[in-house]
A protein has these predicted regions:
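Intrinsically disordered, low-complexity segments enriched in small/polar residues
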Residues: 2-247
Length: 247
């Protein structure tokens, strides 16, 4: 599945979820809503749940980073696990760069976890949200998401066997483009049964050379900053003199 199709299907699924939510109120307000009404609710829902960070870089640091070939990198936390996938990496960052995301996910399985290698998705991708689950059948196919599991988590019901569960999430990059890319791959295989994945609204930001989006890693990132947006929707951080400060 191409990234553009993935984004389109995620938006379509969210639209359906909003429709289903409104159907539950039909007994109270039986008048059918128009497509434009659903679109308005969809837009407001996304706006209410969007998180964003603005990264400011001092002039001297920007010049040095660019001359040395450093990329601006982001990673997303899942559960209590260490960050282990480069969510996005950018070369064309400027003095002010904004990165944002919404809670639109895709579940997948991978056959391996290997540091310094890009994620290789082995199963099909399934659009899924918090409070939903997907069954990986004995043939290795993920079924459509259904309600199930903890409200703040995504649940994999594994009937297949040894697999590394993974999650992708939709983001809007510093270039304004929307794309869904991996945020997490379990470093250890899981066996049959249920595995609960809990995305956390905390991200890691750092600069690194010779790295690509979707690269897995198993060591801490130097000169990084962790930004917790659990109780906030936006934050700004300044990189100046080789260190980070809150703005």
């Amino acid at each position: 599945m191409s990234q553009s199709n993935a984004v389109s299907k995620q938006s379509e699924q969210l639209h359906k979820d909003v429709q289903e939510a409104f159907k539950s109120f039909q007994s109270v307000a039986p008048t059918a809503l128009k497509t434009t009404d659903y679109s308005k609710v969809l837009t407001s829902t996304l706006a209410a749940t969007q998180k964003s960070v603005k990264i400011q870089i001092a002039a001297g640091d920007l010049t040095l980073l660019k001359q040395s070939g450093y990329k601006l990198c982001f990673a997303k936390k899942v559960g209590n696990e260490a960050y282990n996938v480069v969510w996005q990496s950018y070369v064309q960052y400027l003095s002010n760069s904004t990165f944002s995301w919404t809670p639109q996910y895709q579940l997948f399985g991978a056959n391996s976890f290997q540091a310094n290698v890009q994620v290789d998705v082995s199963t099909n991708l399934v659009n899924i949200g918090l409070g939903q689950q997907s069954i990986l059948d004995n043939a290795g196919l993920l079924g459509s998401a259904t309600s199930g599991g903890p409200d703040t988590s995504i649940t994999l019901v594994n009937n297949y066997g040894a697999i590394h569960p993974g999650l992708s999430q939709l983001s809007t990059g510093i270039d304004g483009k929307q794309i869904s890319t991996p945020i997490y791959v379990a470093s250890a295989q899981v066996v049959t049964g249920q595995t609960v994945l809990t995305p956390v609204e905390t991200i890691l930001v750092w600069f690194e050379q010779n790295v690509q989006t979707s690269t897995m890693f198993s060591t801490s990132r130097s000169q990084s900053i962790e930004i917790d947006l659990t109780f906030d929707n936006s934050a700004t951080r300044l990189y100046s003199g080789g260190s980070w400060t809150v703005v």
